[in-house]
Amino acid sequence: MSLKGSNGKYSASVVVPVSAQKAWGVLTNYESMAGVMPDIQQAKVVSRSGRLVELLQTYKAPYTFGLSINARLQVQETPPSRMRYQLISGERIKELQGIWSITPVRGGVLVRHQLQVVPQLPSFLLGTYYELIETNLRQSMQILAQQMLKG
């Protein structure tokens, strides 16, 4: 597992010995991630139109300082290799966008998550927030890899 970046701009990646289709199936099973990922309390697909998905997620984790934070995301899927998402609306989030990519490599796939997040927080909390979100990203990538292996 690799995590690069700081201050809300990150690239996390992990190699998983599964097919791209299997990895994609786990990654896009949005509602099943609630309670499995350390920060996703609830997840609901609000609408789907072709490759566009509208998703409502509730986050609760150390980086939310104990609060449940709701976010509505638009996801553009390009199966089985790429997913782009961006914030439509959210509580205490100024900006949230990212790209998931699945790239075949020898012995499996490289799963990469590029993320940009700007919370709506007092500036004195930002350092703590970024430390906590980095820990969460590491945990999330490891759990995602485990879910892909279980399939």
Locations of the language-model features?
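Hydrophobic ligand-binding cavity/cleft-lining segments
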Residues: 1-48, 139
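A generic structural signal for beta-strand entry/edge sites
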Residues: 7-9, 50-52, 80-82, 106-110
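Short, surface-exposed coil-to-beta transition loops
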Residues: 9-11, 67-72, 94-99
